[in-house]
C-alpha cells in the first residue's frame, strides 16, 4: 500500500472549488477575516469557525446600518446614501447608537434638537392667563 498519488488526497484541478464565504452563504470574505485574525496577534491560534462567525456578524451589522441609512435617504428624497444618512440612521437607533456612541462620522452633522427651554411657551386661552397674572 504505497499510494498511487492520483487516486488519494486532494485533486489538483478540483471542479468543486468553493469559497468558505459561499459555503456559509455570506457576502463578506471569510478567508480575509481569517487572515486578519491570524495576523492581528489576537491569539496564538484561530479556530475554523471563528472567522465564519465574525464575517456573519460584520455582514449583519453592515446590512442593518445600510437598511436604516437607505430609509433615511428615501425620507430626504435622495437616491444616494451620504454620510449624513449614516449618521441619522445610527443616532436614531437606540442599539446602534449605544454600539457606535463614541464614533465620529465625517461629514455626518448632528441630530436636529432644540432644547425645551428655548421653545416659545404655549398659551391656551388668553383670558385665563391675564387674570392669573394679577
UniProtKB/Swiss-Prot annotation:
- Where do the TM regions start and end? none
Modification N6-acetyllysine, positions: 6, 10
Q: Which SUPFAM superfamilies match?
A: Histone-fold
Gene Ontology, cellular component aspect: nucleosome; nucleus
Site description Not ubiquitinated, residues in chain? 121
Q: Name the keywords, alphabetized.
A: Acetylation, Chromosome, DNA-binding, Methylation, Nucleosome core, Nucleus
Acetylation in keyword set: yes
Q: Where is the composition biased (Gly residues)?
A: 1-11
* Spans annotated as Disordered: 1-24
The UniProt entry, under CDD domains, shows: HFD_H2A
N5-methylglutamine carried by residues = 107
Q: Does the keyword Ribonucleoprotein apply?
A: no
Q: Which Pfam families match?
A: Histone, Histone_H2A_C
Q: Which InterPro entries match?
A: Histone-fold, Histone_H2A, Histone_H2A/H2B/H3, Histone_H2A_C, Histone_H2A_CS
Where, subcellularly, is it found? Nucleus; Chromosome
Q: Which GO terms describe its molecular function?
A: DNA binding; protein heterodimerization activity; structural constituent of chromatin
Entry PTM: Acetylated by ESA1 to form H2AK4ac and H2AK7ac.
Its assembly, as annotated, is: The nucleosome is a histone octamer containing two molecules each of H2A, H2B, H3 and H4 assembled in one H3-H4 heterotetramer and two H2A-H2B heterodimers. The octamer wraps approximately 147 bp of DNA.
| Additional comment | In contrast to vertebrates and insects, its C-terminus is not monoubiquitinated.
Q: Which family does it belong to?
A: Belongs to the histone H2A family.
Function according to Swiss-Prot or TrEMBL: Core component of nucleosome. Nucleosomes wrap and compact DNA into chromatin, limiting DNA accessibility to the cellular machineries which require DNA as a template. Histones thereby play a central role in transcription regulation, DNA repair, DNA replication and chromosomal stability. DNA accessibility is regulated via a complex set of post-translational modifications of histones, also called histone code, and nucleosome remodeling.
| Listed name of the protein | Histone H2A
Q: Which organism is it from?
A: Gibberella zeae (strain ATCC MYA-4620 / CBS 123657 / FGSC 9075 / NRRL 31084 / PH-1) (Wheat head blight fungus)
Source taxonomy: Eukaryota, Fungi, Dikarya, Ascomycota, Pezizomycotina
Query: Quick one: which gene encodes this?
Result: HTA1
Amino acid at each position: 500500500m504505497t499510494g498511487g498519488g492520483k487516486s488519494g488526497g486532494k485533486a489538483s484541478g478540483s471542479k468543486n472549488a468553493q469559497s468558505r464565504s459561499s459555503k456559509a452563504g455570506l457576502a463578506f470574505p471569510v478567508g480575509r477575516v481569517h487572515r486578519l485574525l491570524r495576523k492581528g496577534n489576537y491569539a496564538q491560534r484561530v479556530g475554523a469557525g471563528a472567522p465564519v462567525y465574525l464575517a456573519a456578524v460584520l455582514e449583519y451589522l453592515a446590512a442593518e446600518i445600510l437598511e436604516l441609512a437607505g430609509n433615511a435617504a428615501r425620507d430626504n428624497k435622495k437616491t444616494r446614501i451620504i454620510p449624513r444618512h449614516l449618521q441619522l440612521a445610527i443616532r436614531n437607533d437606540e442599539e446602534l447608537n449605544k454600539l457606535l456612541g463614541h464614533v465620529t462620522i465625517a461629514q455626518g452633522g448632528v441630530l436636529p434638537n432644540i432644547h425645551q427651554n428655548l421653545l416659545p411657551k404655549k398659551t391656551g386661552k388668553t383670558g385665563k392667563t391675564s387674570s392669573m397674572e394679577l
